[in-house]
Amino acid sequence: MIRWLLLMYLGITCQGVTDIHSRNLTNSLKVIYEWKYIDYDFGSDEKRQAAIQSGDYNYTMNYLLDTDQWGDKTFVIIMKFNGVPSSLNVITNKTGNGGPLLAPYPDWTWAKNENCSGITSAYKIEIDMCDRLWVLDSGLINNVRSVCPPQLLVFDLNTSQLLKQVKIPHDIAVNTTTEKGALVTLSVQLLSCEVNGSTLVYIGDNEGFALIIYNNSDNSFQRLTSSTFASDPRYTTFTINGESFTLQSGIFGMALSPLTQNLYYSALSSHNLNYVNTEQFVKSQYQANNVHYQGKENILWTQASAKGISDNGVLFFGLVGDTSLACWNENRLLDRRNIEVVAKNKETLQAITGLKVKRRISFILVHGFPLEYEYVLAVSNRIQKVIYGFDFNDVNFRILIANVNDLIKNTRCISP
């Protein structure tokens, strides 16, 4: 009897691990783009050589970070280091020796940011249901040096015209006590399609440990602080495919649930999963020192990176040390037993730094109407190789895709 109870207990607590081994998760995500190194469509070989000679382009310093899709366009973010000609780009239909060539968005003039009027260092992007591209520009070069104020930019994707450009004040962008700040993640809460409508944008400061709320209707900012935004010193060592590095990082990935209006987040250097309900922010019924943050400490077995969420409340997130993608359904108890690994690949999932859940129209017609389904779009980039060195003869950067329903089939991420 005791032995049976023990086995039953182990079966419950280790159920996720058992399921992982019983399912083939290696090819759950399909690679749709891949690069050995990042290169651009400069317009001519002469212009490309000039960019190399001037130092504007150095292929060894270009690292893929984020992505999003709209129509036939796939947008990509390249971390802004010296040698990166453009941080906000689209993938062209041209291919170089490293992979598909990129082109700056909206055009090259925006990438040449000599007076801080263009784009310095796009870090994260999000496309809303009103065909608008929201761009978070950290203003940082080499991830540390601030050369321009951070800003939010909004583009009309139908015309590629700028709708709005808002500089983020210094006392909002940094922790005024430590003077540290790095605005590296965002989530858009669409409330209106009007240019100056009451859309809210949530921005994570992963060095100053804060959550920033931008109100599009009046261009106001609010900086919130909480211990849940801070890194945990126990989890500042990251190991990816046997290579370790140290990083003290706060909020990195966020996802806003369309079902509950919960904003899910976690400090990158932690094993936690947290959330805050945004209804109080929408109704302006809150005080900065009286916001209720919820979540679970040490619910994860490794650090969580980028996040995305489906319309019916399935939260997806990258697991750094596990080289995997996991999910949890917010209709279930927030408990480790309800977290499922749905994709795992030591080769193709080394550090998921960008993640979106998108809606696509299928060519399949049901009763005369096109079938709509959701898919996961992910970036993996071997980020540890920034320290250990990339082999540019090997594939280093990937964009992957999978149908949401296929990923969660026969898992606890299906709604109860």
From Swiss-Prot:
Family listed: Belongs to the major royal jelly protein family.
Domain of life assignment: Eukaryota
Keyword set, alphabetical order: Glycoprotein, Secreted, Signal
Main function: Component of bee sting venom. Component of royal jelly, a substance produced in the hypopharyngeal gland containing proteins, free amino acids, fatty acids, sugars and other nutrients, which is fed to developing larvae by worker nurse bees; may be present only at trace levels. All larvae are fed some royal jelly (also known as worker jelly) early in their development but it forms the principal source of nutrition for larvae destined to become queen bees.
Residues bearing carbohydrate: N24, N58, N93, N115, N158, N175, N196, N215
Upregulation: Unlike many other major royal jelly proteins, not down-regulated by the ecdysteroid 20-hydroxyecdysone (ecdysterone or 20E).
Signal peptide: 1-16
UniProt entry tagged with the keyword Transmembrane helix: no
Tissue-specificity statement: Expressed at very low levels in the hypopharyngeal glands of worker honey bees (at protein level). Secreted into bee venom in the sting apparatus (at protein level). Expressed in the spermatheca of adult queen bees (at protein level); expression levels are higher in mated queens than in virgin queens. Along with Mrjp9 expressed at very low levels in the head of worker bees compared to other major royal jelly proteins.
Gene Ontology cellular-component terms listed: extracellular region
Keyword Phosphoprotein among record annotations: no
A Pfam family reported for this protein in Swiss-Prot or TrEMBL: MRJP
Database matches in InterPro entries: 6-blade_b-propeller_TolB-like, Royal_jelly/protein_yellow
Name of the protein in question: Major royal jelly protein 8
Compartment(s): Secreted
Main location: secreted
